[in-house]
């Protein structure tokens, strides 16, 4: 839906796109597109399941889709680093990972969540994870909690963590977390990356070369630096 040319066209009509594009942030503007979903989609779309691009679906999501949000603005799975995030944002009751969000678009429109998110960006000084921090702050107290099977964390930075969690059978949505060693990098040596690669072999993009991201050691060193910057304790 979004591309470079499309972004320029929408910036002329949408002040929200211009706002997000003008932000001084190390993160790509695309991380904020989920906030625009109530505006992108017509009013007839009252609910949507948002998934990050680094997620693999391993079973039916009908049960998740049929969940009744009621007066909740969204539902998500607690972030693996929730304790660390709540130290930064003590006012947030629960902190969910924004990679899987069941969103109540009807209420997002009625309560102007997009506008409130933009205001939050203007007033917050410390952003660990911009869109995720904003969603958890603006929707504070009205985010339902989902079982971990709906956003099962898979970190390929196993040399940094010193441990590896096996992908359990009940995991429906597997999320390859972390900013560096992704399964589509040729330097990713984690055996669990084979799950993602097995799906790739069945896709239209199977003949496209995978990305190079420097050595795995370099990627893991960058992750260590980020852990200290975020105040995360070394494992």
Q: What do these predicted ranges mean?
A:
Residues 98, 103-235:
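A glycosyltransferase accessory/donor-loop signature
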Residues 39-41, 64-67, 90-93, 126-127, ...:
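A general structural signal for short secondary-structure junctions and capping/turn motifs
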Residues 25, 86-92, 117-126:
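Active-site rim elements
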């Amino acid at each position: 839906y979004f591309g470079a040319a499309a972004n320029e066209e929408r910036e002329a009509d949408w002040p929200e796109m211009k706002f997000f594009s003008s932000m001084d942030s190390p993160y790509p503007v695309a991380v904020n597109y989920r906030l625009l979903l109530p505006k992108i989609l017509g009013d007839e779309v009252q609910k949507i399941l948002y998934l990050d691009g680094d997620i693999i679906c391993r079973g039916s999501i009908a049960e998740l889709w049929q969940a009744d949000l009621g007066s909740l603005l969204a539902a998500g799975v607690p972030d693996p680093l929730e304790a660390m995030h709540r130290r930064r944002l003590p006012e947030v009751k629960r902190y969910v990972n924004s990679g899987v969000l069941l969103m109540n678009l009807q209420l997002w429109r009625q309560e102007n969540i997009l506008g409130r998110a933009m205001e939050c960006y203007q007033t917050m000084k410390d952003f660990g994870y911009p869109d995720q921090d904003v969603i958890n702050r603006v929707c504070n107290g009205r985010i339902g909690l989902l079982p971990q099977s709906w956003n099962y964390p898979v970190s390929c930075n196993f040399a940094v963590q010193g441990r590896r969690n096996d992908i359990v059978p009940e995991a429906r949505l597997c999320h390859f977390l972390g900013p560096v060693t992704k399964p589509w990098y040729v330097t990713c040596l984690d055996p669990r990356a084979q799950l993602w690669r097995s799906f790739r072999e069945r896709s239209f993009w199977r003949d496209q070369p995978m990305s190079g991201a420097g050595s795995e050691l370099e990627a893991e060193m960058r992750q260590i630096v980020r852990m200290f910057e975020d105040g995360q304790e070394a494992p």
